[in-house]
């Protein structure tokens, strides 16, 4: 698929593990390689072709607005403001806003450092149709995956030969890749999202979606980093130094 022009950033989390190193600073504004964390996420989405961006902030995230507007040149940026109860509720809220405008869209967590080249490839491959063996249809959703694992609680994923996700979490057997905080969803799939209280975590939604038999594509990316802890920042900065090198 080419030309994904809509995306969302989930930037409403508390960032509790980063707080000890950056007290009083909202997670999206934590500096990484001299720029706010949210800058790198927005820049990679822009490189993927995104021109319309929805950003979810919590009630303490107002300072993020001006920082993001400076980093999102060429994109129309709109904000949602909500103190959500879970990562699932946040994803659902952003997805439903996007589904009213776009046939397919990307969603990223604010802590996902993904090289621009990988973001472009994810946008291109996340909606590509399967061959005749797969019925010639496109996936309902897609997950960005990486083999770089440096997370306390990684969500493992198993793929078949066609790139379809066959198992997540405890259902994964081979455990050769993990999710990285970058997602794609069709408007049709977004219209069928369960209620905000159905899941306590975003990963629970994805596990259930794969178990239901829905066509979910896994797109293998290079080295990506989730910035959850102060000790993740050096790894993220090493990845950033290689952006489009």
What are these language model-derived features?
Residues 5, 51, 103:
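Short acidic/polar active-site loop segments enriched in Thr and Asp
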Residues 123, 127, 131, 164-245:
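Catalytic-core segments of class I nucleotidyltransferases/pyrophosphorylases
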Residues 64-66, 72-159:
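Conserved beta-loop-beta/alpha segment of the NTase-like Rossmann-fold superfamily
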Residues 1-23:
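N-terminal nucleotide-binding beta1-loop-alpha1 segment
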Residues 35-52, 66:
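A short, N-terminal amphipathic alpha-helix
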Residues 57-62:
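A conserved acidic beta->alpha catalytic loop
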Residues 24-39:
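Short catalytic helix/loop segments, enriched in acidic residues and glycine
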